[in-house]
Amino acid sequence: MPAIVLIGAQWGDEGKGKATDLLGGRVQWVVRYQGGNNAGHTVVLPTGENFALHLIPSGILTPGVTNVIGNGVVVDPGVLLTELRGLEERGVDTERLLISADAHLLMPYHVAIDKVVERYAGSKKIGTTGRGIGPCYQDKIARQGIRVADVLDPAVLAEKIEGALELKNQVLVKIYNRKALEPAEVVENLLEQAEGFKHRIADARLLLNQALERDEIVLLEGSQGTLLDVDHGTYPYVTSSNPTAGGASVGSGIGPTRITTVLGILKAYTTRVGSGPFPTELFDEHGAYLAKTGGEVGVTTGRARRCGWFDAVIARYATRVNGITDYFLTKLDVLSSLETVPICVGYTIDGKRTDEMPMTQSDIARAEPVYEELPGWWEDISGAREFDDLPAKARDYVLRLEELAGAHVSCIGVGPGRDQTIVRRDVLAPS
């Protein structure tokens, strides 16, 4: 069987956890392929139980599914153990979680540097979560990182941490006037934490490719979203990894020819957390309505999300960049009770119209949305389970988004629950 990639098509928080949870009962593997605990997935089970996951794949909540933290992820050991403990206390079987030996470990000095750099950045700060993600990826690229497999050899681990702290302590003490970290203490704490996860360390790329050869289905789950991609997003207001479809292959060890379906997740409106351009952002009562009705507060940061109307320009861009084959449209129910529902179909920049993503960040920062207004609907759609159950105006809205985004809207979320979903096309069915 092929691998399937699940991609956020906006600035994150699109509802990827709901999509993974919906598909999880029909796949054998769920893989997190990038990011760290700077993002969160919310899953609401049929029982009404609400789970917020930050590092562990959403498939952990589905019996029988093997979950993998892939090589593209940066893992904070303390956060991992806390999340595992929280799941186990609620009766979740966590034995089905594996961690790639090649994933990088997020160290205390990464968090310390992240926080002081953001604080000193002043007006130029980018809105980092302060969890050390960026500095950890910096060390990975600079070939100074600590990998998960290093905890299996304490001597090698100690040597690597001592080498890293020779430089990190210089930065912390001499530039930022912070206290130096003791290498022996860092090593001791990490080895103690490793006792709680080293039995999970695995050659993930081998296991995943063997699973595909056995015709098992592998679901690759991204965090954040396309517009936060370090290469394809609204740079520099981005994350430090590649949440796009290309990152799924790199961050899991599964070759690109084995990926046949790319499922993009789109919210029926647009949100963003932190700094950066946001052409359709609302500062009026409509923005307040979307924030309140949609419960728009970040799962990981607790920060209020900025809210705006649906932006078809970035949706079309996400389709192109990721090769999206299908869309899962979430939170359509939030738009009920609006007299009209605007859709951004293009931008004007210095008086000139464009329907494509601006090439430069200065252009996108000046982009003014061009809206097309569709009539709203007043009916409660949370009980709809077939497309024809939706009011005609809601169906028209979905079909217009589909046309503008350039890929089929195969699933529609009409509420937070697993069962509050309309399936127009089975994305797991053989094509």
Curated annotation (Swiss-Prot):
* Known catalytic reactions: IMP + L-aspartate + GTP = N(6)-(1,2-dicarboxyethyl)-AMP + GDP + phosphate + 2 H(+)
Location(s) in or outside the cell: Cytoplasm
What pathway is it annotated to? Purine metabolism; AMP biosynthesis via de novo pathway; AMP from IMP: step 1/2
Q: Which residues bind GTP?
A: 12-18, 40-42, 305, 331-333, 413-415
Annotated Mg(2+) binding sites? 13, 40
The EC number(s) attached to this protein equal 6.3.4.4
Cofactor binding: number and manner:
Binds 1 Mg(2+) ion per subunit.
Record-listed substrate binding positions: 299-305
A GO molecular function held by the record:
GTP binding
Q: Which Gene3D superfamilies match?
A: Adenylosuccinate Synthetase, subunit A, domain 1, Adenylosuccinate Synthetase, subunit A, domain 2, Adenylosuccinate Synthetase, subunit A, domain 3
The alphabetical list of record keywords is:
Cytoplasm, GTP-binding, Ligase, Magnesium, Metal-binding, Nucleotide-binding, Purine biosynthesis
Task: Tell me which residues this entry annotates as catalytic.
Answer: 13, 41
Please give one Pfam family short name: Adenylsucc_synt
Q: Which cofactor does it need?
A: Mg(2+)
* Xref: SMART domains: Adenylsucc_synt
Which family is this sequence assigned to? Belongs to the adenylosuccinate synthetase family.
Q: What does this protein do?
A: Plays an important role in the de novo pathway of purine nucleotide biosynthesis. Catalyzes the first committed step in the biosynthesis of AMP from IMP.
**How does it associate, per the subunit comment?**
Homodimer.
Q: What is the name of this protein?
A: Adenylosuccinate synthetase
Instruction: Record the organism.
Output: Mycobacterium sp. (strain KMS)
